[in-house]
């Protein structure tokens, strides 16, 4: 690995397709259910009308929050500049390794979107929280590998203990062994 190399952590096309099917596909199915109800083509029209309407709105909301994943912005989730003076950055935000206090990929309470999607949450030493959206199109092991290989060696001791404390010894040794045998980055 060269000093100051840029590593791109990219999304998985399979997960992008599932997000599209789950939001747009189910939205169309619910719209069809609503249509069946309002044209009285089913004897359950009293259930089909409100259920179709509500679930169509729900799926439309899901499609809207997943929409950036279907654009070129969803190709690369974040980039890592390696080395001692490295940083995690996207087109909008940048955090140096020395400023990271805690890094994790989890659901959050900062918005309604956090109920449905995991984001990369970086807490800095000056108590700011930086959120990098993932739209659930990056698998957790890929994120773990990026942190373990390129970020963790350059973090301060508190950040290292926060990262390692998220996992049991068995979990961590299992995924470290997997990264050695089958690297994805």
Swiss-Prot record:
It is a lipid-anchor. Residues 1-29 form the signal peptide. It comes from the Bacteria. Pfam families: DUF5381 (PF17353). The keyword Lipoprotein applies. Its main location: membrane. GO terms for cellular component: plasma membrane. PROSITE patterns: PROKAR_LIPOPROTEIN. Disulfide bonds: none annotated. Keywords: Cell membrane, Lipoprotein, Membrane, Palmitate, Signal, Transmembrane, Transmembrane helix. This is Uncharacterized lipoprotein YfjD. It comes from Bacillus subtilis (strain 168). The gene is yfjD.
């Amino acid at each position: 690995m060269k000093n100051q190399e840029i590593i791109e952590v990219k999304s998985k096309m399979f997960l992008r397709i599932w997000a599209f099917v789950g939001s747009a596909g189910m939205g169309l199915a619910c719209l069809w259910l609503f249509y069946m109800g309002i044209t009285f083509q089913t004897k359950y029209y009293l259930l089909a009308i409100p259920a179709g309407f509500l679930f169509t709105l729900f799926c439309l909301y899901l499609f809207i929050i997943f929409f950036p994943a279907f654009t070129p912005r969803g190709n690369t989730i974040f980039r890592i500049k390696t080395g001692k003076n490295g940083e995690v950055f996207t087109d909008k935000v940048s955090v140096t390794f020395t400023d990271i206090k805690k890094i994790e990929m989890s659901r959050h309470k900062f918005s309604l979107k956090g109920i449905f999607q995991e984001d990369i949450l970086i807490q800095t030493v000056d108590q700011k929280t930086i959120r990098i959206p993932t739209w659930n199109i990056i698998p957790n092991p890929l994120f773990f590998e990026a942190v373990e290989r390129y970020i963790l060696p350059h973090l301060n001791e508190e950040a290292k203990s926060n990262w390692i404390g998220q996992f049991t010894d068995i979990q961590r040794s299992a995924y470290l062994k997997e990264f050695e045998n089958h690297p994805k980055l």
